[in-house]
Design a protein with these regions (language model features):
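Conserved class I S-adenosyl-L-methionine
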Residues: 1-12
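Short coil/turn segments at secondary-structure boundaries
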Residues: 9, 31-34
Length: 195
């Protein structure tokens, strides 16, 4: 995989998608998508590329998948596989069916061999449910936690990559990742390949 579409990227931090991808393959192309003006300001300053690759930022909205794909085609070759990343973003879409439809429309514009990566907080503990309710009552942009089965439903029609839909720290853990950390995380993730 040499092309990545990171939808709902949020504020740049350490080891952003382009840094990790271009460290492994300097010719990788990455497109970040968000609609937050604060993210845009930081992205413009911090998201640079290797000379061999390309990194771009789109001021675009998850709710318009076709416009996202059209704009991304300025940097990515959409006739070749793309890694679509939607990390901790779908929780902002209140209606589950609408969230699934947005994912389906994005994947429909990508060729066979593309991969979908999703992670989101889940309604797997009373503490997380209470925290979500308090956050949503605060006036912030709401974030809805979902059952694990709904996270898994985003991958319908795709070939799940092992180990499937699991808690984030359990997805290919490194030698220093402990079971204790996994037990404390109310976020699940998965990777699916478009056949």
């Amino acid at each position: 995989m040499r092309q990545f579409l990171d939808v709902g990227t949020g504020l740049p931090t350490a080891d952003n998608t382009h840094e990790v991808a271009q460290r492994v393959a300097p010719d990788s192309r990455i497109v970040y998508v968000d609609n937050d003006p604060i993210v845009l300001a930081h992205a413009s300053a911090l998201l640079t590329s290797t000379p061999e690759g390309r990194t771009a930022y789109l001021d675009a909205d998850l709710y318009d998948p076709e416009a996202v794909l059209k704009a991304a085609a300025g940097t990515l070759d959409l006739s070749r596989p793309v890694g679509l990343m939607i990390l901790n973003t779908l929780g902002h879409v209140a209606e589950y069916d609408r969230a699934r439809e947005l994912v389906r429309r994005l994947m429909a514009g990508l060729p066979a061999g593309s991969h979908l990566v999703i992670s989101d907080s889940t309604a797997t503990s009373e503490g997380m449910i209470a925290a979500s309710e308090a956050y949503n009552a605060s006036g912030a942009v709401p974030y809805y936690v979902r059952p694990v089965a709904e996270i898994a439903g985003f991958f319908d029609g795709l070939e799940l990559v092992e180990p499937g839909v699991v808690r984030v720290p359990e997805w290919r853990p490194g030698p220093s990742d402990g079971v204790e950390a996994a037990a404390a995380v109310d976020a699940y993730c998965g990777v699916g390949r478009k056949p």
